[in-house]
Every structure is written in C-alpha cells, then in structure tokens.
C-alpha cells in the first residue's frame, strides 16, 4: 500500500543520480598517517614525508651547496622530490607574538602596538604605501615521495644536507592544515586535526576525503579554478630559458631591485612548486637528441623543433660531468575574484618572460585538475606513461635544477618580532637584537643626511621601550626629545643642568676586572682634560703619572674630590708615589705641568662644577633617558671630555643589565664627536665608545653608535676595528660612500651584495629602506608604519613643531599625537582598558 496513492515519489534511482558526482578528493594523495614511519601512505602506495625549510633571500653559496647535496642523494627509483614555496597571507602568529612582547602598560605604547599589528594585518591584501604589495610570509616546504619506505639513513642524509636551511620535520596536522587552506580559503587558518583510527568498528576515511569542505565551490572552468571562495590560475613553462642564473631565478617570484620593480610583484597569494624526478637516464637524453636532430620541419613546427634541439644541446653540454633530473615547474596564483586572479597571472607571466633569459610560459586549462594535485605535496604520480603524456617536464643538470628551486624569496630577518619591517617582495620581517643565537647585541647605524635615520631609530627605541627595555640615548640635535616626552622619559640637557659627572665614581663596578676597566677609562678622560685644547697624544710617562694619581685617588677614598685630588697628587709628586721605583726626578716638572693643565677642570676652574664632588647623574631609576649635548658644541675644550664622561657613566650602567630588562644605549651623531684636525689624537675618545661595546657584550646590554658613513670608523683608529668586531648587527641606510668603505676594508661586500646595498633608498613619506646585516640574515627591509605610529616616530622639524604647538596650546602629549594622526583619544584609552581587562 502506497503512502500517497497515485503519486510518483522519489525513486532510489533518482536519489542515487542526485548524489553521484566526481569527487576531486580522488585526485589527492594522502590515505593515512603511519606514526611508526613518520610518513603518509599515499594512494599510489608511495610513502610521503614532508619538512619545512627557512627560505633564503638570495642564492648564497651555502644554500646552493645544500640544494646540490640534496639533489645528488641517491634516492630510490621512482622518487619524487618537491620544493614548494607558498606566499602565505596568514601572518597572525607573528603579529600576536609581537603584541605579546609589548608589555609596558602605557596607553600610547599599547595603542601604537595594536595599530601597527592591525595595519600590517590589513596589508595582507596590499599596502598602498608599498604600491599595493601584500604583506605575507613566504613558506618553503620539502616533500619527498618514495615507492619504498625512505628509511632512517636517507632521512638523516636529507636533514644533514639541509641543516643550514633550518630544516624541521613537518607534523602531519600542519601539512593537512596547509592542504585545507589551499582548497577552502588561503586567507583564513584551518584546523589540522584528522581521523586516523577506526571509530565504533568503522575504519577511518582516507585523509584525502577529509580535506575539502562541502561548502566552497570547487569548479574547473577554462583557465580558472574556483575553490574556497577564491579563484586560481596555473602557469607552466612551455620552454625553459636558454640558461638560468641565480639572480634570474630570484626574479621568478618578484623583483628584488627596489622601487623600480615594485610593479613587478605578484599581488596576492601564490604557490610555486618544482617537482624533481630522478628516473631519466643519460641514454634517454642522447636518444631524444638524435631524433630531434634528424627531423626535417618547416613553418611553426620548425620553430618548435628548433627550440627543443636548443634545449637538448644545452643539456648535452653538461651530460659528461653532471647528474641529470627532470623537473616540472608550476606556478599557481590565488585571487579573491576572477579579475584579480587574471591580473596576478598576467604579472607572473610577465616576470617569467622578461629579459634577460626569458622563459616561454603558458596558462593551463585542460590539465588543471591534474596539475593542482601535482603541485601539492605527494600529489605528482610518477608513472612514466603519465609523465610522458603530461609533457610538462624538462631535463636539466642538478646545478640548473638547484637554481630553479623556489628557495629565493625575500629577506625575513630572524628571531622574535621585537621589530617589524616588510621586505621588497612583501615578506613580514621580524628582528630581535637580543636573539640568544647572537653572541652580542650591539649594532652600528650608518646613514647620510636625509636617509631616514632618525625615524628608524625613534621607531627602534620605541619598540624596545614598549617591551620593557631601559633606553639611554646620547644625542646632539634634539632628534629624540618628542619621543622622550611621549614615553614620559627624562630629558637631560647637559649644558643647562648643573650636574656633577665625577669620572672616579666606581660604584657600579661588579668585579676587579670591571674596576680596572673603569680606572683605565678614568685615566683616558683625565688625559683628555690635560690636552683639551690641543687634543694631542700623551707620552707614556704622562699616562703613567695620571694613572698613578687616579689609582691613589680611588684607593685612598678621595674619589668624591674629583680632579682636585688628582691635581693634589701631581702637584706633590713624588711624595705619594707607591714605591721608590715610582719616584723619577725628571718627571717632577712633567707632573706639575699636568696639574697646571688640569686647572680648568678643578673645583675652582671654569669647568670644575662638572667634575668635582659626588656624582649627581643618577639615571638608574629612569626607564627612558635622553642626554642632550647640543649646547656644549660651542665649548670645544669641554665637549670631548663631557662626551667621554657621559658615555662612560651611561655604559657603566650596563653592569646592571638583566635578561628581562635589558639596557639599550644609543650614541647618535657619533661622527660629530670625532671631528679631527692635523696632529690631534682621538684615540681616547674612541676608547670610550670601545668600552661601551665591550661592556655591553659582557653584560648582555645593547650599545650602538650612529655614523654618517662607515668610513667614519677610520677616525676611531684601532678602536674602529674593536667596534666592528663587537657589533653583531649593522643597519646601513642610503649612502654614497659604501664603495669607499669596501676599499678601506671596513665592509666585506662585493658583487651582488654590494650592488644590493647601494640600491637602498628612502622613499619618504611612504617608507624608508635599510640594509640589515646580522648573524641571522642579510638583506633589505622597509620600515612602513601606520599614521598614528608615524607621528610618534617622526623627527622632521616642521612636524615636531606642530606637535610642540599643540602641547603649548594645552593638549597632553597623547592628545597631540592623536590630533595630528586624526585619531580620537577616547579610542586609544578604551583600547587600553580592554587590553587591561584581558590581561586581568
């Protein structure tokens, strides 16, 4: 009996027809994760293992050697090796870590950190200040699929060859997360969980069946693939370039030469896969060459055959002394819509086909279902007839294949995200001067006028202040006065305040070595006083007299008497000499002359109030301090002495530095301290800076000087080399004298790296560039900030004047910055309250 007589209901046949479909999951390779093998079992009975590497900005020698070592490993027959770079728009982990580091509970600091993170997060779809280049994280994956289990020995060989590229095994959940994002939406994170064990007696579905979600479209239409609310296109080379160079390969994923090539960047997420097959023998190469050479052809077919003959000829040149592999390069771009995907594909095609050494590139359509899976880990099925029918592979020597590998992306810095920059290709750069892998935390900055130095350093000081560091800046010119005000810091004008800077204050020295170092510095300071007007060198006898006088002053507890105590010892020499051997009759007039030369620095002298009595410069409780020396430039006899005393006093504080609250010392405009005339000796002044670098290295502080040219280090004499050796990081901004610095053996750059350095530019007001050379990497970074942070960091005279005018008109510093940046102060305070609530 029918439930509805006479009504034709849904039949099983119609029901089955409604649910029958082609499942793209059938193309995906992964069946199950086998924990014992740390590998995926794949649909073709292969075993897949994956790693993540740290991509390099450029093809440095150690990178190419690592790749050559990898490609020369004797893998089993039928092995497929894939190197895959993914321009990942998901930068939230780095931004979250950046915010977690900004622990100082100050409304302005927290607002700047939040707005920086939001600005860069929004930049994943393109930053206007960078000509719409998106901010991203280039990730590099290595996938190896073998017909037999890879085994511990081969796995160890792979990891040893790539150790210098930061290789790590990729957990299965991370790889599955990447797969899910490709198919379901690259802009959002995806879970990595998957079923691997049977439940309720039912076997777990294959991993391939757990990747693609039911909701988003998955449709192949001509040259487009609609997947995960995004549109993808694929490009492959129809013919390779006649030859490949490292620089040419670098440009396959975007220009690297600066603003002139900003339009040569792929404006969204993309994936570049180089699949390497190890099955083709040299016999097959020679056989194909003979067939092609014997062909007679005309018209367009002749052109095609000619290109293939040229390709084979290039290969045969290497055949006698190099291993050969087959490679399949594929480039996928992912747009938010068809228009963006089309524009991205056109730009990628232009990059590959540009001179010199152009490739012939085609957009794929019919083969898209196969090529999509083949461009993902383990998704290329190396059955010989299939590869032959696919016709997308090229044979080349492993040296050429290593250059084609997508390992050159962009400079990425290194360490925790204490500082955030953006690379020329959009890489989010993280940098930490206090990274534990670096053997010292010191730095040098070099920048000619107008290169963006003050903005860069204001930003650097603000970022470290935000994470709890103590900031000490010695400056000439007031570049940090506004920042000091905004950070509720202490601004000390040395020429205006009646401070006592007693060079014999040894209270912070922690051990005998520190005390002797402090005494040696005090001797250099007093020697500078004794020759203040001439800056001439002192003789060995003069040095030893001063050293004996200062040792007596300290040992006898007369340190608070300052220069008066030294003059007393010198004037009565040899009465207080330590032994008969220290009494030299002909040095009596020398000692009295030294005492006479120090008269201006005694308590009754013109400058005596600076150096006699207990020290009153106590900044140990201050979080942010600027010591301004501008007023003293008009007193040349005093200027160098004050510089030495101030540098010495500030760097002695490094004895108190701690890992959780490091001290950060910056000496700006150091070259102005080192002005020199014929016959003058600047070694004593240079030694003050050298001591700063040594103390910072010993006590895990950070000490840095700012120069207008790296050649200024020659003014420091032998101490210049000490500074270079004790400064792990260099910030080199736009300059015109780097060639000369190389000639002077100050910089050890040549060729490509030197050209890269000389390409650094300040593109104000959009961004400024800086060449960073650190133990964690070398390359060019761009400082680009949101409007609110811009007004915190700027030191341009007209913009500082606008800020000061608002403060004089009654705004507090935070309100002044908000008004200039067009931000409601209530938003800043409300945001800070919300953050405080979360912290609670």
Q: Which ranges hold each PLM region?
A:
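Post-Walker A helix-loop "phosphate-sensing" segment adjacent to the P-loop in P-loop NTPases
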Residues: 462-472, 487
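Extended, folded cores of ATP/NTP-driven motor/assembly subunits in large transport
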Residues: 1-406
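P-loop NTPase motor domains
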Residues: 64-76, 371-429, 435, 476-701, ...
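Walker A (P-loop) phosphate-binding loop of P-loop NTPases
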Residues: 450
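Hydrophobic anchor at the beta1->P-loop junction of P-loop NTPases
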Residues: 445
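Hydrophobic positions on the alpha1 helix immediately C-terminal to the Walker A/P-loop
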Residues: 456
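P-loop NTPase motor core of the ASCE superfamily
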Residues: 128-131, 433, 512-567, 711-840
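Conserved lysine of the Walker
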Residues: 453
